Amino acid sequence: MADNFDRTADERIEFTTSKEVTVAPTFDDMHLKENLLRGIYAYGFESPSAIQSRAIVQICKGRDTIAQAQSGTGKTATFAISILQVIDTALRETQALVLSPTRELATQIQNVIMAVGDYMNVQCHACIGGTNVGDDIRKLDHGQHVVSGTPGRVADMIRRRHLRTRHIKMLVLDEADDLLARGFREQIYDVYRYLPPATQVVVLSATLPYDVLSMTTKFMTDPVRILVKRDELTLEGLKQYFIAVEKEEWKFDTLCDLYDTLTITQAVIFCNTRRKVDWLTDKMREANFTVSSMHGEMPQKERDSIMQDFRQGNSRVLISTDVWARGIDVQQVSLVINYDLPSNRENYIHRIGRSGRFGRKGVAINFVTSEDVRILRDIELYYSTQIDEMPMNVADLLG
């Protein structure tokens, strides 16, 4: 069910917003199309989350919008609903374009748009790298109301004139901080140049570093701002621990000791490099542990089937790089292990946010060598949080 996050945690989120932003307490108050409302309720949403109740009406009015939202707060549905409200399904042309940093996220967004727009006969295509270009060309030539994609492939399809931009009225940049961190700036600017001058721009980002704000000034006119108060990007409900490992080499034995605990539910283990993911996966398998792994170098088909197995619960332990850390919605994950602490502290909340899916309880365990102590302290300071040494009864915490 879509509507299974913790409402009380949601209600506690405090925002600083532009003065014209009001709160719509129900979806009915938003004056949405009848068939869209049917789709929203059929999808499992009962009432809007904090970000939805503030942002949807502003986006539907055509305002450029910057919304600060973490994974799991209902942000994907925020722009999915807004897009479905403003497009004209009688016109078989692309009217909204969503760019996101990973193929998995782009596909997940496509799934949400198709599901919520189920009664509207909407056409939405995921235009992503690593897939057959011929399929893209066929789908786009056929006509799609919405395209959800990664910047490189989208820019390519626009340049080849298969993705027609003249009817586009909304550009959504999801996980904008990560789009820029992954070096997509040039492709985003390329795409933007092809869009009609009056295109509305909606930016969603968990953090708002300088480069995100500088991009918004180039793309946006008098944007509405819906920002979570700094200290409310919360790690609430997540228990965070560290295990002191004297040397890097000892991390592996520590992980093996924890394996039985990991499989109580599902766990994700993060490493900082693709090479480390492959190395750890091989080593775990040699020791007869069942694990699956995923990183950005894998062919798209393989990544899709690994994600599907994990979503369906067929695999219990997934080893990954940060490619997985943004926005991938797997409800059962309640344990995250940072085998390596993230090199970028802003990724910490994305990684462990995976374990608490917005108000769901979760446990995060950080492996810390003596060299890592400084990074751990930096993370604690940055998030005003406390990370304690792990107690012996970690299995009880997951019960």
From Swiss-Prot:
Binding locations of ATP: A69, Q70, S71, G72, T73, G74, K75, T76
Superkingdom: Eukaryota
Helicase ATP-binding domain segment(s): 56-226
Catalytic activity: ATP + H2O = ADP + phosphate + H(+)
Coiled coil: none
Keyword hit for Cell cycle: no
Pfam families to which the protein is assigned, alphabetical: DEAD, Helicase_C
Position of sequence motif Q motif: 25-53
GO molecular function: ATP binding; ATP hydrolysis activity; RNA binding; RNA helicase activity
Record's GO cellular component terms: nucleolus
Short sequence motif named DEAD box, residue ranges: 174-177
Cell location: Nucleus, Nucleolus
Alphabetical UniProt keywords: ATP-binding, Helicase, Hydrolase, Nucleotide-binding, Nucleus, Ribosome biogenesis, RNA-binding, rRNA processing
UniProt-listed Enzyme Commission number(s): 3.6.4.13
Residue stretches making up the Helicase C-terminal domain: 237-398
Example GO biological process: rRNA processing
EC category name: hydrolase
Its job: ATP-dependent RNA helicase involved in 40S ribosomal subunit biogenesis. Required for the processing and cleavage of 35S pre-rRNA at sites A0, A1, and A2, leading to mature 18S rRNA.
Family note: Belongs to the DEAD box helicase family. DDX48/FAL1 subfamily.
Domains (record comment): The Q motif is unique to and characteristic of the DEAD box family of RNA helicases and controls ATP binding and hydrolysis.
Protein name: ATP-dependent RNA helicase FAL1
The organism of origin for this protein: Coccidioides immitis (strain RS)
